[in-house]
From Swiss-Prot:
Taxonomic lineage of the native organism: Eukaryota, Viridiplantae, Streptophyta, Embryophyta, Tracheophyta
Placement of PPR repeats on the sequence: 154-189, 190-224, 227-261, 468-503, 504-538, 539-573
Stated family: Belongs to the PPR family. P subfamily.
Keywords assigned: Mitochondrion, Repeat, Transit peptide
Protein name: Pentatricopeptide repeat-containing protein At1g26460, mitochondrial
Any one Gene Ontology cellular component term annotated for this protein: mitochondrion
Organism listed in the record: Arabidopsis thaliana (Mouse-ear cress)
Compartment(s) of residence: Mitochondrion
Coiled-coil regions listed: none
Length: 630
């Protein structure tokens, strides 16, 4: 009743302070249309003006709430990591989810033991909750356990704390400051602890501090010894700032200790050595890696392998080229074993260059390695190009392995037996492509020539006879190089008599060259007339050799006659042939023939050039010089 009176008096006071000017004559009505609370409540009468059923026919309904039926709808779909973690598998009560972050972390620090905290940190590491991890650890170490004693972390738990600080951008100095208090908890830093510090140094490229820390780890020993990751971080750090020598020293230490290098560090080392031209250093590193079983599987990328091979071939480093081809062979093998298979094929031009480098460096291993990877790349689907076979023949010839050289020649002839005759003759010419084999056959004079001839003769009488005109032509030309006309002529006759073969144009050219070299121009002319009479078509080299035979005999006029015949046959004289002719005309003081040579040079638009330097040497008065010296 008192409250009712207080309300009535308050209303009357409001009426006195704020009268209604519009209804001053009328009695004052209460603002509320509802009775006082002490009376029984009445149900409000529903107004037909606000009935939603009246508007359903004229308005479009809203779409359903998208959050219904999908508990994951509230998560931020723009972030791969949800902001609200799931505690379905944790020991945290579900009531903590609605608390503020700080009280929740404080409550967790009071309820979780070390093992539970380790499990939670593992979950938070997966979700990258570094800030919560750092905050919870700092609160947890200041809390008491269930026995009322301060919580003490072990090294694994502390490493989680270090990782959280590292991921939050802590500097190397901050990381060192965080490692120092580990002694207060009776915890010794292990290798993983120092590796986290090294990662911070790696980001800041602090090489000197990293080297000191690495030395400290080596001195501490036991659980603090550096591992593979430690050396990778330090080596990669030095390569990143361009300190390649220091990186090589650390890598040398790691390899001597038997540590395993990562593929990235090995690739960076290879790239650095190749870029600076330190191929010998790279060979040494590769050999040390191959000596350790754990590092045998290291292999640069396919593109880098090609680059290594190119640089090694340019510098004629046969060992490095062999290792590059070995790496490529690994890639080809891995690609074939993969499902689906990945096809790798080496460039055949690179193999040819490798064989040429093997010939220059006399490396048998590079010859075998180059040919092996070429066969692996071709996969038996087609034969190698003639240039590859010829490069292989020349490589074995430079090594002095004539047996394998002639075996490769037999492979070339078998692979291209169905080719056109002109193509085969040009491909197997002893004057051009097979000339290194000719030089190898005549290296020791008649001793080597006779040995090769008897081997070919025995092969022609075997179960699978091998008869080759190209091989015999090499012997004929080799005899001509040693001025052994008798052996050259006997070998030429043996082509048809002993081997049952027909001499080709290269056979006649080699014999003609042998006669011309010993100044038997008449016999050389007879050889030319003989081959023309039996229907063998001479080539441009035949005429050039006949010109040389006349010039050796100091007969420029006859040589010019041969040149005229050469032009009539449809060939053009070479610049070298015309220069030889002019030189002989000058020395013989034959101005008439010299003018004809100049006319031929103008006709075929050949620039002869001057021979002042040759003439100076030719006109030196050596007898006067001796008289002055005496």
């Amino acid at each position: 009743m008192a409250s009712h009176l207080f309300t009535r008096s308050r209303i009357s006071l409001l009426k006195t302070l704020k009268p209604n000017p519009f209804t001053s004559a009328s009695p004052i009505r209460a603002i509320s249309g509802t009775p006082f609370l002490s009376q029984d409540p009445l149900l409000a009468t529903e107004s037909t003006d606000h009935d939603p059923s009246n508007h359903q026919s004229t308005s479009t309904p809203l779409p359903p709430n998208p959050a219904t039926g999908s508990p994951l709808y509230q998560e931020n779909w723009r972030s791969p990591i949800p902001n609200t973690p799931s505690f379905n598998q944790s020991l945290v009560p579900l009531g903590f989810l609605n608390q503020a972050p700080a009280p929740r972390i404080r409550a967790l620090s009071e309820t979780l033991d070390m093992n539970s905290l380790l499990n939670m940190f593992a979950d938070w590491t997966a979700s990258q909750r570094w800030s919560d991890m750092k905050q919870l650890f700092e609160v947890w170490v200041r809390s008491l356990d269930k026995n009322g004693k301060p919580n003490k972390p072990d090294v694994n738990l502390y490493n989680h704390y270090l990782r959280a600080n590292l991921m939050m951008g802590a500097s190397a100095g901050d990381m060192l400051d965080l490692v120092a208090p580990m002694e207060e908890f009776s915890v010794e830093p292990n290798t993983a602890s120092y590796n986290l510090v090294l990662k911070a140094m790696y980001q800041a490229r602090e090489t000197e501090a990293a080297m000191k820390l690495l030395e400290r780890m080596l001195l501490l020993g036991k659980d603090s010894l550096p591992d593979d990751e430690s050396y990778d971080l330090v080596i990669g750090m030095h390569f990143g700032v361009g300190k390649n020598d220091e990186a090589m020293k650390v890598m040398d230490t790691a390899l001597k200790s038997g540590y395993m290098l990562s593929t990235s560090v090995f690739t960076e080392c290879v790239r650095s050595c190749v870029a600076k031209g330190r191929t010998d250093t790279l060979v040494s590193i590769i050999e040390r890696c191959k000596a350790v079983d754990r590092n045998k599987s290291l292999c640069p990328s396919w593109i880098l392998c090609n680059y290594i091979a190119e640089v090694a071939i340019q510098e004629d480093n046969s060992k490095l080229a062999f290792y590059a081809f070995e790496f490529m062979f690994k890639w080809i093998t891995r690609g074939e074993m993969a499902r689906p298979s990945v096809i790798f094929s080496v460039d055949e031009g690179l193999v040819v260059a490798g064989l040429a480098s093997a010939a220059r460096t006399c490396s048998s291993s590079l010859v075998e390695g180059s040919w092996t990877i070429l066969k692996q790349s071709l996969r038996g689907r087609k034969a190698a190009n003639p240039a590859s076979y010829i490069a292989k023949i020349n490589a074995y010839a430079s090594l002095g392995n004539l047996q394998k050289a002639f075996t490769s020649l037999h492979e070339l002839e078998s692979a291209y037996a169905d080719s056109e005759k002109e193509v085969v003759e040009e491909m197997l010419s002893p004057f051009t492509s097979l000339y290194p084999l000719v030089v190898a056959c005549s290296k020791k004079g008649f001793e080597t020539l006779d040995e090769v001839y008897f081997q070919l003769e025995s092969l022609s009488q075997g179960d699978t006879p091998y008869k080759s005109v190209a091989a015999l032509n090499c012997i004929i030309l080799g005899c001509a190089n040693t001025w052994d006309l008798d052996r050259a002529y006997q070998t030429f006759e043996a082509i048809s008599a002993s081997f049952g073969l027909t001499p080709n144009i290269d056979s006649y050219n080699a014999l003609l060259y042998a006669f011309g070299k010993v100044k038997k121009t008449f016999e050389a002319t007879n050889v030319f007339e003989h081959l023309v009479s039996i229907g063998v078509k001479p080539d441009s080299r035949t005429y050039s050799l006949l010109v040389d035979a006349h010039l050796i005999n100091r007969d420029p006029k006859s040589a010019l006659t041969v040149v005229d015949d050469m032009i009539k046959a449809g060939f053009e004289p070479s610049r070298e042939t015309l220069k030889k002719l002019r030189r002989r005309c000058v020395r013989e003081m034959d101005d008439e023939n010299d003018d004809q040579v100049e006319a031929l040079a103008k006709k075929f638009q050949i620039r002869m050039g001057s021979e002042n330097r040759r003439n100076m040497l030719f006109n030196i008065d050596y007898s006067r010089g001796r008289a002055l010296n005496n």
